[in-house]
């Protein structure tokens, strides 16, 4: 039986920056992209096919806490180019290190650049912890992890799909949300399977549904479960058990740049 989850929408704010040079593009299905990345995939708390830079997070905490006690460090992801070559999306991750891991914080900003005009805008998630960080600022609860990063485009380049990974350090309370940016309307939708909202289950974002490209696919379960089921989620929040032939896909080209990775800037 389908069930319904809460969805949240918001518009992206815009600003300007120099354009990134566009390169030739091709479409990459999720299965091939994940396979190509396997040799260098970092550890991900949810074993996602689109991992967050967890090795960097943990090494940064260990290094800064041991040498300085506390500090701020930054990480910049590679760009994800749209199939039509007109947009690039990337994230800048910030880690505020405290002597205790459970008091440290990881947050992020995801940028979307129009490569023809050079216009840059910020895409934001409306998931619970992302909203908490936006509204509370320095008064936010310690230990929050909130990382938004692009994972794929639609085949027509009219929608961008991003993974919002959030939870708390030193706990098993982590999960994924999907953030969809609509090109024609310049708005975003944040959604997750109904089980995440109603039963506090854990979910892993897998990509667009191949059988229904307007929906996204998650793997959902609880810690300790041997079998996690695949569910599709529509933009109105309707959550339905995926069919046996479901195969998640994404499109776009990941642009490998020299300036991606750990950033020198710190304070």
Which residues does each predicted region cover?
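Sequence signature of WD/YWTD-type beta-propeller architectures
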Residues: 2-267
